[in-house]
Amino acid sequence: MSRILDRVDSPSDLKGLTTAELGILAEEIRQEIITVCSRNGGHLAPSLGVVELTLALHRVFTSPEDKIVWDVGHQAYAHKLVTGRRDRFATLRTLGGISGFLKRAESPHDVFDAGHASTSISAALGLAAARDLAGRNNKVVAVIGDGSMTGGIAYEGLNHAGHLNRDLVVVLNDNEMSIAENVGALSNFLSRTVTSEFVHTLKKDVETFLGGLDRIGRNVLKVAKRAEESLKGLFTPGMLFEAFGFEYIGPIDGHDIGRLTETFEKVKRFDDAVLIHVLTKKGKGFAPAEAKPSLFHGVGPFDPVSGEIVKGKGGATSYTGVFGQALTRIADEDERVVAITAAMPDGTGLGSFSARHPGRFFDVGIAEQHGVTFAAGLAAEGYRPVFAIYSSFLQRAYDQLFHDVCLMNLPVTFAIDRSGVVGSDGPTHHGLFDLSYLRTLPNMVVMAPKDENELQHMLKTAIDHNGPAAVRYPRGNGLGVPLDQSLAPIPLGTSEVLRAGSGTCVVLAVGAMVGPALEAANTLEGEGIDLTVVNVRFVKPLDRELILSYVGRAGTLVTIEENVLQGGFGSAVLELLADEGVGGVAVHRFGYPDRYVEQGEQHELRSRYGLDAEGIAGRIRTLSAR
């Protein structure tokens, strides 16, 4: 028997389906998402939670004429399946396949690229303003999760939208979670829910009737408004959004397609800013994901029946795990150490720290800007905060790094996870810019370990340093080296010669590139090319003395970094040589080009860009033949 899903090639195909057929389709979509994610990994639980919401939106609104803006994109899989990408869905998150996020280049139904949180309201408001300037009358809808509502930009968008009072629909998808459980006053506030969509129509009718009467009628209207505000404020979160200038409708069962459809049909007739509060269950339809939504938020391959995660090859602890263990040990001995995360306690390895030192652990929500300045405040009072954060998310707080940390030379440590290419999440999540944007900041120390043991010592170095310091490390397992129990700081700006070759080529490798550089050197040795390999350790401050010492002896310097070449470590070396007036040495920079790197497994991307051992050996072989 054929699936209804196989007959859905565009959102228009949903409009002729009955509510019962849409219910069947919802389950078919869930099964498709589970099947593909079990092989490819992906953001399973968020997408399972919004299937009915997605179908109702596409049934009522006419995409792409009507613009549906999805926040983050974690919940976009059902949207992709009903917008013409069913036949390619099996390629989700693979090299050359469809993205796990929204991509304008992929489909006209993806009206705004997404990957980071809290941007949808601002983007949708811009689309609505453009519509009005052009004299069009299409609808614009932003779909944002309650987790994304912990980000400040969401409120900047709400504030501006309420001021402009444009024809804009915001759907708040409330599953009481972002990645882990939500934190903060907003989460508590949203749990106070009771009202319905008929209130909007009723209020308009009453206002029209009383407003048309004499002064007594208008006074009654004022009293009624005050009474409504007082009572609603006791029971609902609607007051918050109405204070921003939005009409508030909800909460609505986000899995009731009929109710959702009815509500969206009514809202289509409104011409002002409306917020619809929808309640959903993260992971719905897959029992393991419903039971452990955080585990299945972003998950690797798993058994599609039991939900058991497919374990990779055994071996070394991940860099994230080693970081968490080392930080906990350091905090055991130093009461000044506190840990901060932006809604990712498990993803950044802080689970053991939060259990051991709950009073010194802070989850700030998806609020990176606040997190950095919060850390600065702690540091200003003598504490040693460690902000564990993914490289791509730290970008969101650049001015806070400059203004609130580095300007005052405050001792804040940034533990930058997921540096380099991260894999299938693609360009929004690769950590390929941190060396460039961090080394430009005065007072900032920037380190990258060659292995997980060196990571421990660099963490100790950063915490002991009386100023800002960053340690960047990759996603994935370490190299399996022994872990020292006693940790000591590394002298700032010192590198380490790991292989002293007799040839004229010196390789300066950063962090995760040290291992492939050594492998390449071993390969080339058998071909008569004897490389010197240096573990740089510090991108800032540079080991000026060592680098300059090789200038007179080496004909070629090769810098290798898992970062974009623009402004990175190789650029720092060139700047040093230019400042010193040094010539007579060829400098070749290996890294990522001036482009956004596509999705793919880490090993696939490193191979494609010549940054695995084979690629490095091949490029140096070519240089040596010149």
UniProtKB/Swiss-Prot annotation:
<dbReference type="GO" id="GO:0009228">
    <property type="term" value="P:thiamine biosynthetic process"/>
</dbReference>
<keyword id="KW-0808">Transferase</keyword>
<comment type="function">
    <text>Catalyzes the acyloin condensation reaction between C atoms 2 and 3 of pyruvate and glyceraldehyde 3-phosphate to yield 1-deoxy-D-xylulose-5-phosphate (DXP).</text>
</comment>
<dbReference type="InterPro" id="IPR005475">
    <property type="entry name" value="Transketolase-like_Pyr-bd"/>
</dbReference>
<keyword id="KW-0784">Thiamine biosynthesis</keyword>
<feature type="binding site">
    <location>
        <position position="175"/>
    </location>
    <ligand>
        <name>Mg(2+)</name>
    </ligand>
</feature>
<keyword id="KW-0786">Thiamine pyrophosphate</keyword>
<dbReference type="InterPro" id="IPR033248">
    <property type="entry name" value="Transketolase_C"/>
</dbReference>
<dbReference type="InterPro" id="IPR009014">
    <property type="entry name" value="Transketo_C/PFOR_II"/>
</dbReference>
<comment type="subunit">
    <text>Homodimer.</text>
</comment>
<dbReference type="GO" id="GO:0052865">
    <property type="term" value="P:1-deoxy-D-xylulose 5-phosphate biosynthetic process"/>
</dbReference>
<dbReference type="GO" id="GO:0005829">
    <property type="term" value="C:cytosol"/>
</dbReference>
<dbReference type="Pfam" id="PF13292">
    <property type="entry name" value="DXP_synthase_N"/>
</dbReference>
<feature type="binding site">
    <location>
        <begin position="147"/>
        <end position="148"/>
    </location>
    <ligand>
        <name>thiamine diphosphate</name>
    </ligand>
</feature>
<dbReference type="GO" id="GO:0016114">
    <property type="term" value="P:terpenoid biosynthetic process"/>
</dbReference>
<feature type="binding site">
    <location>
        <position position="368"/>
    </location>
    <ligand>
        <name>thiamine diphosphate</name>
    </ligand>
</feature>
<protein>
    <recommendedName>
        <fullName>1-deoxy-D-xylulose-5-phosphate synthase 2</fullName>
        <ecNumber>2.2.1.7</ecNumber>
    </recommendedName>
</protein>
<feature type="binding site">
    <location>
        <position position="286"/>
    </location>
    <ligand>
        <name>thiamine diphosphate</name>
    </ligand>
</feature>
<keyword id="KW-0460">Magnesium</keyword>
<dbReference type="Pfam" id="PF02780">
    <property type="entry name" value="Transketolase_C"/>
</dbReference>
<dbReference type="GO" id="GO:0000287">
    <property type="term" value="F:magnesium ion binding"/>
</dbReference>
<dbReference type="InterPro" id="IPR029061">
    <property type="entry name" value="THDP-binding"/>
</dbReference>
<dbReference type="GO" id="GO:0008661">
    <property type="term" value="F:1-deoxy-D-xylulose-5-phosphate synthase activity"/>
</dbReference>
<comment type="similarity">
    <text>Belongs to the transketolase family. DXPS subfamily.</text>
</comment>
<dbReference type="InterPro" id="IPR049557">
    <property type="entry name" value="Transketolase_CS"/>
</dbReference>
<feature type="binding site">
    <location>
        <begin position="115"/>
        <end position="117"/>
    </location>
    <ligand>
        <name>thiamine diphosphate</name>
    </ligand>
</feature>
<feature type="binding site">
    <location>
        <position position="175"/>
    </location>
    <ligand>
        <name>thiamine diphosphate</name>
    </ligand>
</feature>
<feature type="binding site">
    <location>
        <position position="74"/>
    </location>
    <ligand>
        <name>thiamine diphosphate</name>
    </ligand>
</feature>
<dbReference type="InterPro" id="IPR020826">
    <property type="entry name" value="Transketolase_BS"/>
</dbReference>
<keyword id="KW-0479">Metal-binding</keyword>
<dbReference type="GO" id="GO:0030976">
    <property type="term" value="F:thiamine pyrophosphate binding"/>
</dbReference>
<comment type="pathway">
    <text>Metabolic intermediate biosynthesis; 1-deoxy-D-xylulose 5-phosphate biosynthesis; 1-deoxy-D-xylulose 5-phosphate from D-glyceraldehyde 3-phosphate and pyruvate: step 1/1.</text>
</comment>
<dbReference type="Pfam" id="PF02779">
    <property type="entry name" value="Transket_pyr"/>
</dbReference>
<feature type="binding site">
    <location>
        <position position="146"/>
    </location>
    <ligand>
        <name>Mg(2+)</name>
    </ligand>
</feature>
<dbReference type="InterPro" id="IPR005477">
    <property type="entry name" value="Dxylulose-5-P_synthase"/>
</dbReference>
<dbReference type="GO" id="GO:0019288">
    <property type="term" value="P:isopentenyl diphosphate biosynthetic process, methylerythritol 4-phosphate pathway"/>
</dbReference>
<keyword id="KW-0414">Isoprene biosynthesis</keyword>
